[in-house]
Amino acid sequence: MKTYLKTPTSDMTVHEIRTIVKETIKWCQDNLGTKCYGVDYSVRTLGEKYTPAYGMYDYSKRTILVFRNHAPTVKCVVRSVLHEYAHYLQNLRWYNHVLQKVGYDKHPQEVEARVVETMYSICWNDIKNKI
């Protein structure tokens, strides 16, 4: 089956989603840079008691998490990985302090991550033949 940005993740296996995440991270490493330590990733199902999110970056575990039950399309998966990879590159030491002062939508690190997200079509054009 050919995979497109609009392909529903509900039609995909976890392995297929993991491949997209892995290739997106490789693209990020080549095009956005890395840190002295690497980043891991995991594709999971987010429990119902949690606030819905496409993904998150776990700073303490240096892991990008993608929640397949909340990222409905391949486009959402790629955008989520780009967004969370931006957080991996950022210094998050004062993240929570700034979050309390300005909120999520105006947080400078969230604004920056949303800008990185917009690179999804460039990323997808580079990785789609590896999926």
PLM regions with names:
Residues 44-75, 92:
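Active-site scaffold of zinc-dependent metalloenzymes
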Residues 82-90:
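Short active-site segment of divalent metal-dependent hydrolases/proteases
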Residues 121-131:
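Long, well-structured alpha-helical subdomains associated
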